[in-house]
Amino acid sequence: MKLHNLRPAKGGEVKARKRVGRGYGSGLGHNAGRGRDGQNSRSGGGVRPGFEGGQMPLFRRLPKRGFKNHFAKQYAEINIRDLNCFEDGEEITPEILANAGFFKPAKAKDGVKILGDGEITKKLTIKANKFTKSAEEKITKAGGKVEVI
C-alpha cells in the first residue's frame, strides 16, 4: 500500500457545510429551512428554554423543595476497614490519608471523620477531626489509640 492508495475510512469523510439561503437552485433558498414567517424565522428569534407557549411551565407548576445549608460541615469520611492497609503501630494523620489517596483535600474542608463500618485488625494511632462511637470502640478494642485534633 502506498500513499496514493489511501482513502478516507467509510463514514469518516468530512461533509461540506450546508450553505442555506443562497438561491432556489441550491435547494435551500427562499426560507432557508426556517419554515414560513414567525418568531423562529427571525435572526435571534426563538423562545427561552422552558417556555410552553403561555401555558404555565412545568418548572413553575412544581413546588420548590428543600434548601442548601451553606454552613454544613464537609468532612472526608473514611471507614475503619480501609485502614487495615497500614502497618501495625503506625500513626495515621489526615495528611497521610490524603497522600495515600483516600480523599481529595478539596473535598475535606472541615477535616476527616472516621466511620465504624467493617473491622480493624491493626493497632493504629489515628488522628482525625471526628470519630463515630462505633469506630472509636473498635479502634480501642483492637489496641489502637484515638486522638481528636
Swiss-Prot record:
Recorded coiled-coil stretches: none
Family affiliation: Belongs to the universal ribosomal protein uL15 family.
Protein name in the entry: Large ribosomal subunit protein uL15
GO molecular function, one term: structural constituent of ribosome
GO cellular component terms, A-Z: cytosolic large ribosomal subunit
Annotated segments matching region Disordered: 1-58
Biased composition (Gly residues): 22-32, 43-53
Assembly and oligomerization: Part of the 50S ribosomal subunit.
GO biological process: translation
Entry-linked HAMAP family: Ribosomal_uL15
Summary of the function given for this chain in its UniProt record: Binds to the 23S rRNA.
Gene3D superfamilies the UniProt entry points to: 3.100.10.10
NCBIfam families assigned to the protein according to its UniProt record, in alphabetical order: rplO_bact
Domain of life: Bacteria
A Pfam family the protein falls into: Ribosomal_L27A
Keywords (A to Z) from UniProt: Ribonucleoprotein, Ribosomal protein, RNA-binding, rRNA-binding
Keyword Ribonucleoprotein (UniProt): yes
